[in-house]
């Protein structure tokens, strides 16, 4: 299974960071470089219908080798990495036979991956880990998923004794900025059901996710020389702070877990004259999700009424919804994945996704798509890592799912 590791190391060398502020599709041209590379690799494997469209979506399929009518099965991952941290010049480090102590990622900058801060790493004592060098994210989200899917499909194509229906694979741009499914052609993809391989911890199986929205707030001020500012100046930074204080502090990401939702400020740029804020809003409950959006709108209204002028402009935009209602209609897709994990000695961890995947949107576009683990941990930052055995097991799970569908 060295193959999956080699692929992963190759893919993370591509800088594919997406950009929320871009209006192009994909949001960054550099995602296309990886996409075109994947196209050539899929052709070499011998897949059919290999293509990359103008929007950067890569698709291909392996034809069925049985006559039995079974659902066409899809596997999907995304090519972009998070805007939250650089994905340029990723330099993976191997930690073999992890001993349970601190891992020095970057000695010069004193960046340490410590069990004191990330106690879950102790689960992987004795295993080989791939970490960052402390300067970038790693890109396991979701280049590990791409490597796992391609390795599994390559293995199946080389072993005709493995019976299977049609297997479709797709790699999307811009998932990290909530646009991964925007131009996904479900009909062209050709699957009846699918799985994203975009989860985290070893064994994760997910079919519930956040309802998600973004909020962009612009606060207008009035700049006057501070020496003569009394009763004249309106400091937009101060007004923005007022707005922030109206958000429930206990409902921030750092205070929530499980099925709890949150408000998360992700950007703050300001001067006296103008301040811009960006939030993301998340909740599993549709009602609580709507309440959270309303609270933000009401906060803007309250401040504008307080000052007697429209200082605060707010735009709230839905991004994706909880896929559970769609997956429940075809629950067998979860049951088969659960069984596949058990058969290859992976303990399934069925839990809600405290985030989103392309599968959330795709499920509402007629393609039910739960989420499988990649094995990665601490996504979107310099403390990201992935155990190599988890990647190898993810490949086994994909192959076993394919086999079980052929028996359906």
Curated annotation (Swiss-Prot):
S-S bridge residues: none
Class in the EC hierarchy, top level: hydrolase
Enzyme nomenclature, EC number: 3.4.11.4
Domain of life: Bacteria
Cofactor(s), by name: Zn(2+)
The UniProt record lists the keyword Acetylation: no
A GO cellular component annotation in the UniProt record: cytosol
Annotated residues for binding of Zn(2+) 1: 78, 141, 198
GO biological process terms on file: peptide catabolic process; proteolysis
Binding site for Zn(2+) 2: 141, 176, 380
UniProt keyword terms in alphabetical order: Aminopeptidase, Cytoplasm, Hydrolase, Metal-binding, Metalloprotease, Protease, Zinc
Molecular function terms, GO-annotated: metallopeptidase activity; tripeptide aminopeptidase activity; zinc ion binding
Catalytic activity: Release of the N-terminal residue from a tripeptide
The keyword Lipid metabolism appears for this protein: no
Active-site residues from the entry: 80, 175
InterPro entries: ArgE/DapE_CS, Bact_exopeptidase_dim_dom, Peptidase_M20, Peptidase_M20_dimer, Peptidase_M20B
Details of cofactor binding: Binds 2 Zn(2+) ions per subunit.
Principal subcellular localization: cytoplasm
Localization of this protein: Cytoplasm
Function description: Cleaves the N-terminal amino acid of tripeptides.
Record family assignment: Belongs to the peptidase M20B family.
Name used for this protein in its record: Peptidase T
Organism: Clostridium acetobutylicum (strain ATCC 824 / DSM 792 / JCM 1419 / IAM 19013 / LMG 5710 / NBRC 13948 / NRRL B-527 / VKM B-1787 / 2291 / W)
């Amino acid at each position: 299974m060295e193959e999956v590791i080699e692929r992963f190391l190759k893919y993370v060398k591509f800088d594919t960071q997406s950009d929320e502020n871009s209006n192009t599709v994909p949001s960054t041209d550099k995602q296309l470089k990886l996409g075109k590379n994947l196209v050539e690799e899929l052709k070499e494997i011998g897949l059919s219908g290999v293509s990359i469209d103008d929007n950067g979506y890569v698709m291909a399929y392996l034809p069925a080798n049985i006559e039995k009518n079974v659902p066409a099965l899809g596997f999907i991952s995304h090519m972009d990495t998070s805007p939250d941290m650089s994905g340029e010049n990723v330099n993976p480090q191997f930690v073999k036979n992890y001993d349970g102590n601190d891992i020095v990622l970057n000695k010069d900058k004193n960046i340490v991956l410590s069990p004191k801060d990330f106690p879950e790493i102790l689960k992987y004592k004795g295993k080989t880990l791939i970490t960052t060098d402390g300067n970038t994210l790693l890109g396991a989200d979701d280049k590990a998923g791409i490597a796992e899917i391609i390795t599994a499909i390559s293995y199946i194509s080389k072993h005709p004794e493995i019976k299977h229906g049609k297997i479709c694979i797709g790699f999307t741009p811009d998932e990290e900025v909530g646009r991964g499914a925007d131009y996904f052609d479900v009909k062209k993809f050709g699957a009846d059901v699918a799985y994203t391989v975009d989860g985290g911890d070893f064994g994760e199986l997910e079919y519930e996710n956040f309802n998600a929205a973004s909020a962009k707030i612009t606060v207008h001020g009035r700049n006057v020389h501070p020496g003569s500012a009394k009763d004249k100046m309106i400091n937009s930074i101060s007004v923005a702070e007022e707005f922030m204080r109206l958000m429930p502090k206990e409902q921030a990401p750092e205070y929530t877990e499980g099925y709890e939702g949150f408000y998360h400020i992700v950007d703050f740029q300001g001067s006296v004259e103008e301040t811009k804020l960006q939030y993301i809003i998340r909740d599993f409950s549709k009602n609580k999700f709507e309440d959270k959006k309303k609270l933000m709108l009401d906060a803007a209204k309250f401040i504008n009424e307080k000052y007697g002028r429209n200082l605060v402009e707010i735009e709230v935009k839905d991004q994706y919804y909880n896929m559970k209602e769609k997956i429940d209609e075809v629950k067998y897709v979860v049951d088969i994945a659960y069984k596949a994990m058990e058969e290859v000695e992976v303990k399934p961890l069925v839990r809600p996704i405290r985030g989103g995947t392309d599968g959330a949107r795709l499920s509402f576009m007629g393609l039910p798509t739960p989420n499988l683990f990649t094995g990665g941990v601490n996504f979107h930052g310099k403390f990201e890592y992935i155990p190599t055995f988890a990647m190898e097991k993810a490949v086994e799970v994909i192959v076993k799912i394919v086999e079980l569908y052929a028996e359906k």
